[in-house]
């Protein structure tokens, strides 16, 4: 485990107002303050894809599949990203956008979860296709093998002919900032199933740019969300942060 990153996590996250609030209220966690969809100013802003809800309104994390781990995951993640790298990350904010929102094109990187419930319409599929082809990078997280068929089917409509392929440990994305030497500690936080990594490459060529990376049987944002609570072992949270940071650095430098 990287002791430097682990120490940084403790220093940055446990001294934050959010962490103090969490300790005060225990399991009755209060929603942290967050600014949403601020005008683009050139800095990296965490962009989460919003899609059809399962009921309710607002940003309730239990009401909408797209909002799982929101907003604590991205708030914690951007703090760590800003501390350990030179990425100009925008803190205390998040962009929550639909795929057919023109604001998507202000972002190089976007994040989507629970793709077993994802059913983009024609407009959203067309926009995602254009965005990926113009240099966008999509991170797919928080889903398991039961969701795979729907995800694979939807991506076949978004990018006809594109193939989801295993992404090996030797791929540059796993050495873009931190050197990931094993996947042994990368598992689903609750089922314990080993996470596997799947991607889509430009022209289906592994030598070309990776335009999408999916954490199958994984949920790295769950570790981000609770990393200031001691809910998961520090080494597992550490690995989740390293993966996320590598994804960002890879996408910004390719």
State where each predicted segment sits.
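Positively charged n-region of N-terminal signal peptides that target proteins for export
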Residues: 1-4
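Bacterial N-terminal signal peptides
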Residues: 6-16
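Aromatic-Pro/Gly-enriched surface loop or interdomain linker
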Residues: 20-109, 115-116, 219-254
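An acidic, glycine-rich "communication" segment
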Residues: 24-30, 54-58, 145-226, 236-241, ...
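Short alpha-beta junction capping motif
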Residues: 46, 104, 109-150
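Extracytoplasmic/secreted envelope proteins and their assembly/folding machinery
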Residues: 74-78, 125, 129, 152, ...
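Surface-exposed patches in mature extracellular/periplasmic domains of secreted proteins
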Residues: 85-98, 140-144, 162-170
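Hydrophobic/aromatic-lined pockets within catalytic cores
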Residues: 136, 159-160, 252
């Amino acid at each position: 485990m990287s002791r430097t990153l682990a120490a940084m996590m403790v220093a940055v996250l446990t001294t934050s107002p959010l962490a103090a609030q969490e300790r005060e209220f225990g399991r009755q966690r209060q929603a942290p303050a967050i600014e949403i969809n601020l005008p683009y100013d050139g800095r990296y802003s965490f962009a989460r894809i919003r899609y059809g809800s399962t009921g309710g309104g607002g940003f309730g994390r239990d009401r909408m599949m797209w909002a799982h781990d929101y907003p604590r995951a991205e708030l914690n993640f951007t703090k760590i990203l800003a501390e350990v790298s030179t990425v100009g990350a925008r803190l205390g904010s998040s962009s929550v956008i639909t795929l057919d929102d023109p604001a998507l094109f202000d972002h190089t990187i976007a994040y989507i979860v629970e793709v077993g419930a994802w059913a983009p319409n024609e407009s959203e599929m067309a926009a995602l296709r254009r965005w990926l082809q113009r240099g966008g990078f999509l991170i797919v997280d928080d889903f398991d093998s039961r969701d795979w068929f729907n995800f694979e089917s939807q991506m076949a409509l978004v990018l006809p002919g594109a193939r989801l392929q295993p992404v090996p440990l030797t791929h540059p994305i796993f050495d873009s900032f931190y050197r990931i030497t094993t996947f042994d500690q990368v598992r689903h936080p609750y089922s314990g199933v080993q996470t596997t990594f799947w991607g889509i490459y430009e022209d289906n060529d592994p030598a070309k740019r990776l335009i999408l990376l999916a954490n199958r049987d994984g949920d790295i944002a769950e570790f981000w969300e609770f990393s200031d609570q001691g809910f998961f072992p520090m080494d597992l949270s550490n690995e989740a942060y390293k993966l996320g940071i590598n994804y960002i650095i890879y996408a910004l430098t390719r």
